[in-house]
Amino acid sequence: MSLRQRLAQLVGRLQDPQKVARFQRLCGVEAPPRRSADRREDEKAEAPLAGDPRLRGRQPGAPGGPQPPGSDRNQCPAKPDGGGAPNGVRNGLAAELGPASPRRAGALRRNSLTGEEGQLARVSNWPLYCLFCFGTELGNELFYILFFPFWIWNLDPLVGRRLVVIWVLVMYLGQCTKDIIRWPRPASPPVVKLEVFYNSEYSMPSTHAMSGTAIPISMVLLTYGRWQYPLIYGLILIPCWCSLVCLSRIYMGMHSILDIIAGFLYTILILAVFYPFVDLIDNFNQTHKYAPFIIIGLHLALGIFSFTLDTWSTSRGDTAEILGSGAGIACGSHVTYNMGLVLDPSLDTLPLAGPPITVTLFGKAILRILIGMVFVLIIRDVMKKITIPLACKIFNIPCDDIRKARQHMEVELPYRYITYGMVGFSITFFVPYIFFFIGIS
C-alpha cells in the first residue's frame, strides 16, 4: 500500500462520524428514542434546501451516509406516558424523560438566522455536559466580548490589542479556508447535534479549535517576560484550554476528529509565520499617520473577498463581525494613543509585577467591567437598529423579514462590519475616555 493510500485511509478514519458518535456515547450523550418517524418529517421539511452545496451527498433515510449540516434536528422524544413531545428545551435546560431515565438536554442556542434548533439528547453525565458547554463557549461571541475588554481595561492594553490582532488573523484565515474546502459537518445520525448555531457553516478546519489554540499560546508568548510569573503556569494553561475547547466541539457533534487536528496544526503554522510581525502591526496601528484609513480599507476589502467565496451562511456574518471588531479596536487604539489616554509602560520597567489585590483595586476593576460592558452593549444594540434598516433602504432590499434581508451581502456585511467596528472602537476609545473622565482609569 502506497503512502498516499495510507494517508487517505487515515483521513477517512479521522473523518468518520461514527467516531464522533462513539465519543459522545462514552461521555454519556445518546440520541433519544423514536428517531425514525421524526427523521421522515425533518426530511420533508428540508427538501427545499436540496440545492445548498452544504446539503449535497445526502441520501434521504440513509442513517450512515454522508449528510449535511442541520439534518435530523428537532427530534421529539417520548414522554413518560408514551406520547410525543415537541422540542421545547433550549439553552441547556433539562427535563425528565422518565422516572429512571437520564435527563435530556436541548441545543445551547437556537440559530436566529436559519431557525434551526438542536435535537434533544439523553445526557447521563451532567458534569461533563456542563464542562464541555463551558469549553465551547470559549469560542463564542459572549466570551470574546468579555475577554478582550477585560484585558484592555483591567490587565494590560498592549497584550489585549495584540491578542486581538492574532485572533482576527487566525479566525479570518480559518473562516475563509472553510468556504474554500467546503466539507460538511459530521452526519446526523449517527452524531447527536447538541449545538446548531454554527451548523450552516462548513466543518474543515474547526475555527473553535483554532481560537482555542491561538489564544492561550499567544497569551503565554505575549506575557512571559513582560509579567513576572512562573512559566509552568503558562505550560499548564495551554494544554488545558486547548484540549477543553477541542474536545467540546467533538462532544457537541459539530466537528470530526480530523477537523480538530487540522485546526490545531493550521493555527501552529499561522502563529509560526505571522507572530513575529504582531509587534510591527500593533505599532503601525498606533503611530502611523494614515493607519485608520488603511485599517478600515484593508479589513473591508478582506470582508468583501470572504463574501465572494461561497453562497450565504452564518460564517459570512461571523467573518465580517471579526474584521469589524479588529478594525474598530485598532482605530480606537490609534486615537487613544495620540490623545495620551492610555500609555504602555516603558521598557525599563519590565518585567511588570502584579499589584497587591486590595478592595479598592478589585472594586475599580468590577466598576470598569460593569460600566464598560453596559456602554458597549448599548452601542451594539443601537447600531443594530440603525444599520440593518439603513442598508435595506440604500440597496432596495425588503426589510419586512430581517432574517431574509440579512442573507444579502449588501445588508449583512455593512451591518456586521459597522456595528462591531463601533463596538471595537468603543472598547479602546470611548470606554477608556469615560474611565478617564470619571476617575477610574
Curated annotation (Swiss-Prot):
Keywords: Cell membrane, Endoplasmic reticulum, Hydrolase, Lipid metabolism, Membrane, Phosphoprotein, Transmembrane, Transmembrane helix. Its main location: endoplasmic reticulum. Ubiquitous, with the strongest level in placenta and kidney. GO terms for cellular component: endoplasmic reticulum membrane; plasma membrane. CDD domains: PAP2_SPPase1. SMART domains: acidPPc. Residues 178-186 are annotated as: Phosphatase sequence motif I. Residues 25-110 are annotated as: Disordered. SUPFAM superfamilies: Acid phosphatase/Vanadium-dependent haloperoxidase (SSF48317). Residues 248-259 are annotated as: Phosphatase sequence motif III. The modification Phosphoserine is found at S101, S112. One of its GO terms (biological process) is intrinsic apoptotic signaling pathway. The active site is at H208 (proton donor), H255 (nucleophile). It catalyses: sphinganine 1-phosphate + H2O = sphinganine + phosphate; sphing-4-enine 1-phosphate + H2O = sphing-4-enine + phosphate. Residues 205-208 are annotated as: Phosphatase sequence motif II. InterPro entries: P_Acid_Pase_2/haloperoxi_sf, P_Acid_Pase_2/haloperoxidase. The record marks D259 as: Stabilizes the active site histidine for nucleophilic attack. Belongs to the type 2 lipid phosphate phosphatase family. This is Sphingosine-1-phosphate phosphatase 1. The lineage of its organism: Eukaryota, Metazoa, Chordata, Craniata, Vertebrata. The gene is SGPP1.
